[in-house]
Structure formats: structure tokens, C-alpha cells
């Protein structure tokens, strides 16, 4: 089960007691809240995985992570996942022999490196799009119309830019959603849900979506703003061409803009059509029903209703999820 802020902790507590989950995934702050209240039995927690460990440190979660680890006495395995190679692992993590104060752990520390040697994957088609104007909104719109209904992540550098881009695209009747850290948790989840299921083909985001967002089948990444550094560029591109899939990455430039050193100068130019196609309609539409498991509602009920009352057939119905409420 998942635990995070932005929603009542009591609902998570009830789920823990009722389900007795084998795996709990949570943010440091919310995990500490449950640990302090003893909402689950720590005697049976033997493995801990900290994802995005480098970013957690960068964002100042040192004390919260140390508190989580300090309340798990039965740990036998600790896994630290990071997109960058740390020179030193903090002592609180409890790995690394002398650093952890545990001599027995030094012989059991294993480092695995899954980073590709090449900066840009061979499965990623990297191209640049030239905008005749410094304000690249119209060029972005034309590019997205050309890409059709394929799932596309548009990256910008600021929250305000997310809102501006989304407002412009929607004024042109282009289906899209916003995603950034200033949004309410429910709004972010709703945007991700629609993007995942194909009812919203374009998600405009800050670099918040560049790490930790695992959505299979993203076809394109668009850099509306040039990334602040090479690391951000790599993580943005990593949202597409995942595993064995192929994908495309487009860099929007105006005539006076220059590529940074970490991006090859000789990447091909993607030419836009003179006649811009109309915005493609999404393949799916998300239908929200204000009932859930608490109301004894299940997938069979929903599908039956859509068949009988909506006149739909099997091919018309996509993913059906029933939440607790």
C-alpha cells in the first residue's frame, strides 16, 4: 500500500489494519507519522528500499530518513537507489562498514551500476525544432498537432510556465494537463491518471515528472525550455525509450538560442508542416463515478452499467479502477 501526505492519515491506518500489507511504499514524513503511532509492527520489517536517495538528500530529507531507519530494528537488507554516484554514503544509512559503525556490514555491501555508457540511448531519436519567434508557444502547438494523439511529456523550467503553456494549448482546443509541485495532491493524481490511461495525451510538467515517474509507453519528450543541466536533460529523456521501447526527444529552440555543450550540435532538425493538422482527439475519455468499494461497488457493476445503459461494447471500455472511496 502507499502512504503520503495530502490525504488523511487515518484512512491509511485503517487500510494497514485491514489489509496487513506485505509492502508499504511511502514518503519519509508520512512513514514517520505511522511509525510514531505504531500503526504497523516493525518487528517484521526486514528490508528497506530508499528510492531517489540522492534527491532525498538534496531536498533535505536527511533527518526524516534517519528517523525512519532508527525505528526499524529488524532490518536485514537496505537498498539505496540513486541516479547519480555518491562519493560518500551518510552514516545514518547503516551501510559501508566503518561509516555505519557496523563492521559486519562492510563485506556485504554490493554496488550495482545500471547506467548506460552512452549519454543518449540508441533507441532515442533526438531532434531539434526551430521556432521563428522567441515565444515558442505557437511552435509547440504546431509540433504537438503534428505528433497527433501519441503520449507526450512537455518539460518547462518553472511552475508559472506550466500554467502559461497549458492555458495557451487549451485556448487552442488542445487536450492537455498540468503537473507540478505547487498543485494539490488530488489534482496531480488526477492528471497522472488521465495521462496514463490515454484520455489526456499531453502532460506539461516541471522536472518533478523527470524522476520517479514510471509510465510505460510514453512516445515523446519535448524540452520547451532547455534543461538547467545535463543531469536534468538525461532524466527528462529517460521518461521515453524505456526498456526495449523506442521514443523521440524534441528540443525547442528559437533562432538566437544555442544548445549547451552536453547536447550534440549536429542533431537533425525536425521540420514542421506548413499546414498544421487539427488537434487529435484522445482515444479515451475518463469517466468518474463518485462511489467506491465502501459503497459495495465493483468492476462488474460498472462494466454492466456501461454495457446496458451506455450501449457500449467490450472494445469501448478500457481500464476500470475501483478505489476505496
Which residues fall in each region the model found?
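Conserved helicase ATPase core of P-loop NTP-dependent helicases/translocases
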Residues: 11-15, 163-167, 175-206
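Conserved nucleic-acid-binding Ia/Ib motif block in the N-terminal RecA-like helicase ATPase lobe
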Residues: 1-36, 44-47, 167-171, 175-179
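Conserved two-lobed SF2 helicase motor
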Residues: 19-35, 192-211
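Post-DEXD/H (motif II) to motif III coupling segment of the RecA-like Helicase ATP-binding lobe
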Residues: 40-119, 263-264
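Conserved interdomain hinge at the start of the Helicase C-terminal
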Residues: 122-168, 311
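Conserved segment of the helicase C-terminal RecA-like domain
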Residues: 229-232, 237-269
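A short beta-strand element within the Helicase C-terminal
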Residues: 211-226, 248-251
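Non-catalytic terminal extensions of ATP-dependent helicases
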Residues: 272-325
Amino acid at each position: 500500500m502507499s502512504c503520503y501526505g495530502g490525504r488523511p492519515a487515518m484512512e491509511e491506518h485503517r487500510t494497514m489494519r485491514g489489509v496487513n500489507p506485505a509492502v508499504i511504499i511511502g514518503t519519509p514524513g508520512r512513514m514517520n507519522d505511522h511509525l510514531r503511532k505504531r500503526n504497523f509492527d516493525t518487528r517484521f520489517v526486514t528490508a528497506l528500499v530508499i528510492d531517489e536517495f540522492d534527491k532525498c538528500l538534496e531536498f533535505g530529507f536527511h533527518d526524516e530518513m534517519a528517523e525512519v531507519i532508527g525505528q526499524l530494528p529488524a532490518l536485514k537488507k537496505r537498498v539505496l537507489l540513486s541516479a547519480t554516484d555518491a562519493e560518500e554514503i551518510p552514516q545514518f544509512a547503516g551501510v559501508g562498514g566503518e561509516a555505519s559503525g557496523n563492521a559486519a556490514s562492510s563485506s556485504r555491501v554490493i554496488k550495482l551500476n545500471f547506467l548506460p555508457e552512452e549519454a543518449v540511448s540508441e533507441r532515442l531519436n533526438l531532434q531539434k525544432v526551430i521556432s521563428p519567434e522567441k515565444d515558442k508557444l505557437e511552435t509547440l502547438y504546431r509540433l504537438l498537432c503534428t505528433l497527433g494523439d501519441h503520449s507526450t511529456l512537455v518539460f518547462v523550467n518553472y511552475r508559472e510556465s506550466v500554467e502559461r503553456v497549458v492555458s495557451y494549448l487549451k485556448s487552442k482546443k488542445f487536450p492537455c494537463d498540468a503537473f507540478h509541485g505547487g498543485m494539490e495532491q488530488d489534482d496531480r493524481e488526477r492528471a497522472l491518471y488521465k495521462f496514463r490511461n490515454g484520455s489526456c495525451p499531453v502532460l506539461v510538467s516541471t522536472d518533478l515528472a523527470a524522476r520517479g515517474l514510471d509510465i510505460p509507453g510514453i512516445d515523446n519528450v519535448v524540452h520547451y525550455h532547455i534543461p538547467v543541466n545535463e543531469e536534468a536533460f538525461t532524466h527528462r529523456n529517460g521518461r521515453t525509450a524505456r526498456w526495449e521501447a523506442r521514443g523521440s526527444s524534441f528540443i525547442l529552440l528559437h533562432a538566437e538560442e544555442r544548445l549547451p555543450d552536453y547536447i550534440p550540435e549536429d542533431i537533425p532538425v525536425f521540420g514542421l508542416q506548413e499546414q498544421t493538422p487539427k488537434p487529435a482527439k484522445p482515444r479515451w475519455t475518463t469517466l468518474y463515478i463518485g462511489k467506491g468499494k465502501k459503497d459495495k461497488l465493483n468492476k462488474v457493476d460498472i462494466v454492466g452499467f456501461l454495457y446496458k445503459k451506455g450501449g457500449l461494447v467490450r472494445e469501448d471500455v478500457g481500464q476500470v479502477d475501483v478505489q476505496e472511496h
